Amino acid sequence: VGFKAGVKDYKLTYYTPDYDTKDTDILAAFRVTPQPGVPPEEAGAAVAAESSTGTWTTVWTDGLTSLDRYKGRCYHIEPVAGEENQFIAYVAYPLDLFEEGSVTNMFTSIVGNVFGFKALRALRLEDLRIPPAYLKTFQGPPHGIQVERDKLNKYGRPLLGCTIKPKLGLSAKNYGRAVYECLRGGLDFTKDDENVNSQPFMRWRDRFLFCAEALYKAQAETGEIKGHYLNATAGTCEDMMKRAVFARELGVPIVMHDYLTGGFTANTTLAHYCRDNGLLLHIHRAMHAVIDRQKNHGMHFRVLAKALRMSGGDHIHAGTVVGKLEGERDITLGFVDLLRDDLIEKDRSRGIYFTQDWVSLPGVLPVASGGIHVWHMPALTEIFGDDSVLQFGGGTLGHPWGNAPGAVANRVALEACVQARNEGRDLAREGNEIIREASKWSPELAAACEIWKEIKFEFEAMDTL
């Protein structure tokens, strides 16, 4: 046929509505808002082209490869209900386009270049279907839910955590003291805040030492296994690994990483080290809202959550649901299930666009954290179930009597809710009553109930379908 130079419509090559997707394809659902006058097929094809083999003009070197084998294909387009100029474009990518075991490469391909594309007003990646063939090239979470429970010897209830506040400004010794008080009071974990790295007022090594001392002391006194998420996030991968190695030498059970600001390459490196050395890995999602908060541009958090399960982490922050809207509850539980379960069926009412089979990748514990306190405990226990971590920062340290009583109040509230649930009571309906009953024999809980009885965070949810 010979080479024909010039610009031709993307849809002639990249829009293939009769394509049958393969079991090995990576499938993506994009919410596309084209510029006025750009037809949906062209916009969808442009996304497929620019995120795979295409460029703005035909090139001579196209003839040196098999485009049919390597090109992304826009295979289906559907309008978004209630939106005038918006639709979901489904794109299939051949597996050969991606490096094995690299979340970094997967994202660079699928979302690396196409979001600045002029023909689109906005673009959002709503969901990905990762085929088992690709998942098998990833290690995934270092340990997973069952192994974590066995390491900690804690079963049949959610785990309790607390972020140490004020997050910045404490000396290492005072920080360790707060850790000890919380763990001694009954929490399972305490946590470095995401931006606690190694600052002038508290260098990382001092913090690690005092926190390790605190958790061993609390362990000896309570007879329970305790942990503190030591944040290993650093300016270079080498420094990050140095911190993880020191944590292992101290014999602590868990370290932490900010996976979006730290980057997927660093995160996967750390996850591999954690599995090889028996460390649990707690993941904080700092910066996620920059990417996922806008409804029509960016990436939904469920995609970032899937990427984390591939890259590796044993816990990840996943919102709280409580005090927000019902619609948001279904969507949050959608990606919570994506983190925990082995197989998740397609369910558009929960924002899940594809059936996802995780084959052998362990599950991740969702962490509920942010503005929660003892009155939320029944709802949190009901919504998240046993396989979760409930984290109360201010809800522990803000107790009028101090840190340890704050921890006691949370532990009593949790045990009361779990017992009530196991006895068949309805936490959604009887939650307040259950907390009131428990507070009669726990002065710490009674004081917490009194101080937070009026607090509400009532804003409309951003994350709706």
UniProtKB/Swiss-Prot annotation:
Which cofactors, by name?
Answer: Mg(2+)
Cross-referenced InterPro entries, in alphabetical order? Answer: RuBisCO, RuBisCo_large_chain_AS, RuBisCO_lsu_C, RuBisCO_lsu_C_sf, RuBisCO_lsu_fd_N, RuBisCO_lsu_N_sf, RuBisCO_lsuI
| Molecular-function GO terms, alphabetical | magnesium ion binding; monooxygenase activity; ribulose-bisphosphate carboxylase activity
Provide the cofactor note recorded for this chain's UniProt entry.
Binds 1 Mg(2+) ion per subunit.
The secretion signal range is none
Pfam families registered for this protein in UniProt: RuBisCO_large (PF00016), RuBisCO_large_N (PF02788)
Q: Which UniProt keywords apply?
A: Calvin cycle, Carbon dioxide fixation, Chloroplast, Disulfide bond, Lyase, Magnesium, Metal-binding, Methylation, Monooxygenase, Oxidoreductase, Photorespiration, Photosynthesis, Plastid
What is the reaction catalyzed? 2 (2R)-3-phosphoglycerate + 2 H(+) = D-ribulose 1,5-bisphosphate + CO2 + H2O; D-ribulose 1,5-bisphosphate + O2 = 2-phosphoglycolate + (2R)-3-phosphoglycerate + 2 H(+)
N6-carboxylysine: modified positions: 191
UniProt name for this protein: Ribulose bisphosphate carboxylase large chain
Q: Which organism is it from?
A: Daphniphyllum sp
